[in-house]
Amino acid sequence: LICYSQMYNEIIKTCENGETTCYSKTWRDHRGTRLEKGCGCPPVKYDMIVKCCKTDRCGN
């Protein structure tokens, strides 16, 4: 599976160990709105939003 690994959809990462999900996670802190992308589908705290998907380059 190929997932984006940075805020801007320029850098991609090939997931390892049979990972079948990509994610895009957003939250706000003292620096403003933050965005993280990668492989997997991580658990999140109540003030975060995570979107998980299962196709190549789907975490826009």
UniProtKB/Swiss-Prot annotation:
InterPro entries: Snake_3FTx, Snake_toxin-like_sf, Snake_toxin_con_site, Toxin_cobra-type. Gene3D superfamilies: CD59. Signal peptide: none annotated. Its main location: secreted. Produces peripheral paralysis by blocking neuromuscular transmission at the postsynaptic site. Binds to and inhibits the endogenous nicotinic acetylcholine receptors (nAChR) in human rhabdomyosarcoma TE 671 cell line with an IC(50) of 346 mM. This neurotoxin is lethal to mice by intraperitoneal injection and to zebrafish by injection at the back of the dorsolateral region. It is found in: Secreted. This is Three-finger toxin MS3. One of its GO terms (biological process) is modulation of receptor activity in another organism. It comes from Micrurus surinamensis. The keyword Disulfide bond applies. Belongs to the three-finger toxin family. Short-chain subfamily. Type I alpha-neurotoxin sub-subfamily. Expressed by the venom gland. One of its GO terms (cellular component) is extracellular region. One of its GO terms (molecular function) is toxin activity.
